[in-house]
């Protein structure tokens, strides 16, 4: 008789891809895509199972990708994502916020239209 007990891992799993893409819960994907456009993100694709169903959208800026989901079970509102940028000052200027100087970075914190938090910073030397 074969055992159905799970086996203990023998080591790290092998992966060929090494990328984490955060999923952010949104109510109105089109409005949020426009908001992320102010940060230089561009809509890559959108999926709906059928017309009128919730949207699942990818936005990207360079090598950074985010998934925006109208599906209630995919993520919780208020998620925090930290983005590193070369220069945080243009972001602060675009959104009319003040840059905070911390020992590890110069940062701003923004909230998208659904309350997801983006901490955007330039690391200090």
Q: What label would you give each PLM region?
A:
Residues 11-13, 48, 99:
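Residues embedded in well-ordered secondary-structure elements
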Residues 23-25, 45, 101-103, 120-125:
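Short beta->alpha transition motifs characteristic of CBS
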